[in-house]
From Swiss-Prot:
InterPro entries: Fe/S_biogenesis_protein_NfuA, FeS_biogenesis, FSCA_dom_sf, HesB-like_dom_sf, NIF_FeS_clus_asmbl_NifU_C. This is Fe/S biogenesis protein NfuA. Homodimer. The keyword Iron applies. Keywords: 4Fe-4S, Iron, Iron-sulfur, Metal-binding. One of its GO terms (molecular function) is iron ion binding. It comes from Escherichia coli O7:K1 (strain IAI39 / ExPEC). The gene is nfuA.
Length: 191
């Protein structure tokens, strides 16, 4: 579920040495499954452990995860990085904003997950986003662009060279993508 590097474990162990005996850490997600999801780590004294918590035992500590946060922390990584500017704890949780779907989930769910977790974060840099409207019986993903992508002069390139290539590579059962958007150029358009 969660990988904690040796450096991060050593950092936590040093901090925990100054806490009440038996105190461990808790890893959690606030607003899981939403665009506002935030991950955190806190101290977890022995009396704060719930029966429904998952206990993840590591060499130097135990990390507790509450029942609600657990699916959103799948594939999460905690590291303690030191460089010329100093040291910092990093927590990467790729599924915090959206729960990972199973490999055997319906095609619509798997495509939607890829759009939300991989493609929309790229488009967000330009203030854009794309939504899956449907998958036709003949295997076309019907998409609708919004935000800065609406009427952007590069939308065709983004659709065919970016999104379509990624989707077809990941989902060979798709035949292609089509744009349902009625593009109206305005100040919101990126290019």
């Amino acid at each position: 579920m969660i990988r904690i590097s040796d450096a991060a474990q050593a950092h936590f162990a040093k901090l925990l040495a100054n806490q009440e005996e038996g105190t461990q850490i808790r890893v959690f997600v606030i607003n899981p499954g939403t665009p506002n999801a935030e991950c955190g780590v806190s101290y977890c004294p022995p009396d704060a452990v719930e029966a429904t918590d998952t206990a993840l035992k590591f060499d130097l500590l135990t990390a507790y995860v509450d029942e609600l946060s657990a699916p959103y922390l799948e594939d999460a990584e905690i590291d303690f990085v030191t460089d010329q500017l100093g040291s910092q704890l990093t927590l990467k949780a790729p599924n915090a904003k959206m729960r990972k779907v199973a490999d055997d989930a319906p095609l619509m769910e798997r495509v939607e997950y890829m759009l939300q977790s991989q493609i929309n974060p790229q488009l967000a840099g330009h203030g854009g986003r794309v939504s899956l409207m449907e998958i036709t019986e003949d295997g076309y993903a019907i998409l609708q662009f919004g935000g800065g992508c609406n009427s952007c002069s590069m939308v065709d390139v983004t659709l065919k060279e970016g999104i379509e290539k990624q989707l077809l590579n990941e989902f060979p059962e798709l035949k292609g993508v089509r744009d349902l958007t009625e593009h109206q150029r305005g100040e919101h358009s990126y290019y």
